Amino acid sequence: MGQKTHPYGFRVGVIKTWSSKWYEDGAAYQKWLHQDIRIKRAIKQYLYNANIAGVEIERAANRAKVIVFTARPGMVIGKGGKGIETLKSGNVGTASKGETLFPGVSSFTDNEVFIDVQEVRKAETNAQLVAENIATQLERRIAFRRAMKKAVSTAMKFGAKGIRVRCAGRLGGSEMSRVETYREGRVPLHTLRADIEFGLAEARTKVGIIGVKVWMFKGEVLQRKARRIQ
């Protein structure tokens, strides 16, 4: 019987590269792994409105480089680079009224932290950003069919080779949960050289949580060099 496989993990080492780049043994491996998970989760929560497509972490010696991929680099960098400094060192004790508190990436690791912000130029064809956009619309009580169809048509218009969108939950406030799927173009999940992006988001509505999944096909990668987030 076939099993579901994560499209990204299925292609790691073939056409995709790891989102954490470092090597350690024993207890240090566990320590760094948990640090990476906490750092990525904290950044996603703190910069929720900045359209974060992904976070990569590179470690060498006593340094940790955190690469943030975003469709809104200006919001992350901030005025005069203040946002970068807040990401690195936090704003606890210095935050202004109404500002979200963030402990800083440095509080999660003993390494010296460097922040690098990379712009995602086409948010319309980034699977994670598309999934979060649909989830946001569902939370605003926009009809799920309208949100899904618009995301599919926009992605194809901006150059995607294929897209599949799946929403599951109490769609439209119905009594029973169900699954709705929209698809356009090719989405070859079994082809290893196919550049498939996968995005997952949750819409927290009054009737419950609605899960949103997006698969985006961007074409076939013929060269051997692994690709990172785009």
Swiss-Prot record:
Gene3D superfamilies: 3.30.300.20, Ribosomal protein S3, C-terminal domain. It comes from the Bacteria. Residues 39-121 form the KH type-2 domain. One of its GO terms (biological process) is translation. Signal peptide: none annotated. Keywords: Ribonucleoprotein, Ribosomal protein, RNA-binding, rRNA-binding. GO terms for molecular function: mRNA binding; rRNA binding; structural constituent of ribosome. PROSITE patterns: KH_TYPE_2 (PS50823), RIBOSOMAL_S3 (PS00548). One of its GO terms (cellular component) is cytosolic small ribosomal subunit. InterPro entries: KH_dom-like_a/b, KH_dom_type_2, KH_sf_prok-type, Ribosomal_S3_C_sf, Ribosomal_uS3_bac-typ, Ribosomal_uS3_C, Ribosomal_uS3_CS. HAMAP family: Ribosomal_uS3_B. Part of the 30S ribosomal subunit. Forms a tight complex with proteins S10 and S14. Belongs to the universal ribosomal protein uS3 family. Binds the lower part of the 30S subunit head. Binds mRNA in the 70S ribosome, positioning it for translation. This is Small ribosomal subunit protein uS3. The lineage of its organism: Bacteria, Pseudomonadati, Myxococcota, Polyangia, Polyangiales.
